[in-house]
Amino acid sequence: MIKKTILLILCVALIAGLVGAGCSSAPPPVPLTEPIPQRANLVASIQINEILTDEDLIEAYDEAEKDPDMPETIEEAMQEIEDEIGIDPRDFYEAVVFSDTECEDGYWGAIITGTFDEEELIENIEQEIGEELTSINYHGYKRYADEAGENGLCFFSDDTFLIGTLDAVEDSLDVAAGDAMPLEGPVVDAYEALGDVWVRVAVKLPPESMEDLTGDEIPVESETLERVEALGASLKKVGQNVSLEIRICLTSPVLAEALKVILIGVKTYFQLTADLPAEAVDVMKKIVLSRSGSCTVIMLTATVYEIEDLVEAIQEEED
């Protein structure tokens, strides 16, 4: 139930962001300061409090169609989550998440900042899992774990804690203690370039996953996809203005420029020949393609009225 509610909230957050789109300038880079281990191939950050207290998001969630068992309002959703885990999600400011997406057994961690009571948080977790957490001294940190040794928890400070699979938690603590090097390279570069935004994510995808993303409609050679070092995406909202950015980072500026030219051609082709509603064509015209270093950059700018018209047109097509 809670997972379903959270997923709906995140979906509405993205929709609300796109609905208000109107800013095309990229934000300045923001460095990654959290202890992210080298094993990770994905890094993401979410400004939790900003999203959950945004008036447009609240309105979008409250008006969205929901299943009968879903909370009617975002206030009800927050209360249900607090009743079950003992914490109001709006008390969390930011979550920086990392993972190894290719690990079949699961490898992930989340560094969360906010206002919370350490003892109360531990009690709530123990009550939720039905067992007591054990703790050891790990690099001077008190590292908690469940009985199976699968998941871990550690408090960096009064307002920051680390939670995740035990191996990911310990790897992060190794980095924090200076016993291991942090994640570096294209994924971090792409993540930092996305700047201070609502949501930002950067990931290294295998070529087969890139092929799934592009599909048959986008004529990009497999050799080019093999040279994609990182894929980044971000969403930022300021007032009624939101920017959506996608960065495809390759091994050289030449490849990035070539991919930009291909995508411009694809955009033009769809605008002229695809059987799309006029509203969709209008939004496609708002897509701006450029190159920044070795990255092909896609920016989308649209007004609330254009997106509303597009949503209505899509609904009419489905009917």
What are these regions (language model features)?
Residues 1-27:
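Secretory targeting signatures
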Residues 49, 113-117, 158-159, 166-168, ...:
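Solvent-exposed coil/turn segments that connect beta secondary-structure elements
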Residues 26-130, 134, 237-241, 288:
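Long, low-complexity, Ser/Thr/Gly/Pro-rich intrinsically disordered segments that act as flexible linkers
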Residues 27-28, 200-313:
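Leucine-rich, highly hydrophobic segment in Treponema pallidum outer-membrane-associated proteins
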